[in-house]
C-alpha cells in the first residue's frame, strides 16, 4: 500500500463499524485483539481476546491470539495452555506449510516464563528461525550453559549472516515484550554476542 497510515485508519474504521454492528462477532474481536497487540495496547488486546475466547473457545486462531496476549500480560501458564491447545487442534494453520508459527508462539511463552529448557526444545522444532525465535534460542542456550561458545553453535552460525546486520535495539522493540527488564537483557545480550 502506498500510504500505510491511511490504510490503518481505514482498517480501524471498518473494525469499529463491525463492532457497532455486532459486538459479539468473535472474528472481529479476534482481529481487534491482534491489532491492539500491534499497537501495544495490551489490556485492550486481552479484553478483545477474552471476549472472542468466551464465544469460540475451540477456534485455534482465537486460542493463538488470546494465548499470546496472556503470555505478554504475564498470565504465562494460562497463555501457554491455550497456545498448546492451538497447536494440538491446528498444527499447521491455514495458509501455512509448517507448524513454525505455532512453535514460535510457544518459544515466546517459554522464554517469558524463563523456562529455557522448554524454550530451546520448542525453538529446535522451527524449520525457519526468524529473528525473534533465533535470539530467544541463543539467549536460552546461553542461560542454560554459560560455558557454551555460542559463536560456534550451529544455530548461531546458520543465521548469523542473515541477522547480524539488524538494528537489534529496534528489532527487540518490535517483539512487543511488555517487560522492560527482559528487553534490556536482550539488548545487552545482542550487544555482547552479535555486535
Where are these regions (language model features)?
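Glycine-rich, flexible loop segments associated with nucleotide phosphate handling
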Residues: 3-13, 96-105
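Amphipathic alpha-helices of TPR/Sel1-like and other helical repeat/solenoid scaffolds
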Residues: 4-22, 46-52
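Residue-level preference for long, well-ordered alpha-helices that form the structural scaffold
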Residues: 3-7, 41, 75, 149
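Flexible helix-coil transition and linker loops at the boundaries of alpha-helical arrays
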Residues: 14-27, 54, 88-99
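Alpha-helical protein-protein interaction modules
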Residues: 46-50, 60, 64, 68-195
Amino acid at each position: 500500500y502506498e500510504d500505510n497510515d491511511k490504510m490503518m485508519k481505514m482498517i480501524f474504521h471498518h473494525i469499529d463499524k463491525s463492532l457497532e454492528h455486532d459486538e459479539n462477532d468473535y472474528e472481529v474481536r479476534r482481529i481487534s485483539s491482534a491489532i491492539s497487540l500491534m499497537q501495544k495496547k495490551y489490556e485492550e488486546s486481552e479484553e478483545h481476546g477474552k471476549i472472542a475466547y468466551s464465544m469460540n473457545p475451540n477456534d485455534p486462531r482465537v486460542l493463538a491470539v488470546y494465548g499470546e496476549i496472556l503470555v505478554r500480560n504475564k498470565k504465562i501458564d494460562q497463555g501457554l495452555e491455550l497456545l498448546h491447545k492451538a497447536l494440538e487442534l491446528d498444527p499447521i494453520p491455514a495458509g501455512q506449510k509448517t507448524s513454525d508459527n505455532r512453535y514460535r508462539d510457544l518459544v515466546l511463552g517459554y522464554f517469558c516464563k524463563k523456562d529455557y529448557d522448554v524454550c530451546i526444545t520448542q525453538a529446535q522444532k522451527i524449520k525457519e528461525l526468524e529473528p525473534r525465535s533465533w535470539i530467544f534460542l541463543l539467549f536460552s542456550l546461553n542461560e542454560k550453559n554459560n560455558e557454551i561458545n555460542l559463536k560456534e553453535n550451529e544455530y548461531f552460525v546458520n543465521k548469523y549472516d542473515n541477522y547480524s546486520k539488524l538494528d537489534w535495539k529496534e528489532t527487540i522493540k518490535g517483539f512487543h515484550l511488555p517487560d522492560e527488564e527482559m528487553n534490556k537483557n536482550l539488548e545487552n545480550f545482542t550487544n555482547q554476542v552479535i555486535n
